[in-house]
């Protein structure tokens, strides 16, 4: 996101982990200005239990050449969407869902196409697997892996297979990128006699659409073996081979 700002791109931070630290990002070179406002702070008397309120001037939000969403902001903007019918409801959800993220990305891409945004975009989502689908929300069963996978495949198909790649054409005035972090789980069934294999939450539809993937271990299965070499009595692993 620091490099994106330096290149004239707008970072669109979608923080469904609710863990993004602006101060840490600023220390790394990210440009953002704190906006201060009066915030009511509760004080509790430990002896009497009496609650009093005082006002302090604190950071309420951040401003700059970026767009930021967390779960609360997603619900505020898209929480009235009923994704099963495509209509809007009278009340807003307080739980963000996978479809909200796709709606967010499509809305911003629409604004760019309509001329309301005149810069390229870097979408950064942290992370797939941190929120469930609309179907899970309605059923009260957050954590249904198959429903999440189906929702990601359907909601993001046009984004990752058309809208983002189309911006790479020379005829496109702006170049857009989607970077995402994917939560994982360990599958013990694929390699019964060896270490568990790392699998992505939310299925593999995003994995198949990804142009570049960075994996952090957990890939050794029964169908893979390490290629090693020995030099001066030391063994070195230099590649893996599929059987």
Locations of the language-model features?
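Walker A/P-loop NTP-binding motif
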Residues: 1-6
